[in-house]
């Protein structure tokens, strides 16, 4: 058995009245059966973040580091690549055309 913070992870059968997370639902093992703690509920789905709503965000594409002493044109190209990666990942709002 190993412990992850306060959660115990084990391939063995649970102890009587131990609280476990099972398939996203909190349960305890009592008299040989799993008992659900709390009511039945739908799983939570994290919404996408928008300019007005907090939510999950996607990971942006990697943009490599600039070389030391890079020319201004190279810096401008790299900054534009970063902005593009943020927009493609829906982290930044697209330009209005």
UniProtKB/Swiss-Prot annotation:
Keyword Transport among UniProt keywords: no
InterPro entries associated with the record: Phage_B103_Gp8 (IPR022741)
Any one GO BP annotation for this protein: symbiont entry into host cell
Highest taxon above the source species: Viruses
Keywords: Host-virus interaction, Viral attachment to host cell, Virion, Virus entry into host cell
Subcellular location: Virion
Cystine pairings recorded for this chain: none
GO CC aspect terms: virion component
Function field: Forms short fibers at the surface of the viral capsid.
Oligomer and partners: Homotrimer. Interacts with the major capsid protein.
Name this protein carries in UniProt: Head fiber trimeric protein
């Amino acid at each position: 058995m190993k412990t992850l913070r306060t959660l115990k992870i084990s391939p063995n059968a649970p102890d009587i009245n131990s609280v476990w997370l099972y398939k996203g639902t909190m349960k305890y093992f009592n008299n040989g059966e799993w008992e659900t703690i709390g009511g039945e509920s739908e799983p939570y789905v994290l919404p996408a973040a928008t300019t007005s709503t907090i939510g999950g965000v996607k990971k942006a594409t990697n943009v490599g580091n600039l070389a030391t002493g890079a020319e201004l044109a190279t810096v401008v190209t790299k900054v534009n690549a970063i902005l593009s990666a943020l927009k493609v990942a829906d982290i930044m709002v697209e330009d209005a055309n």
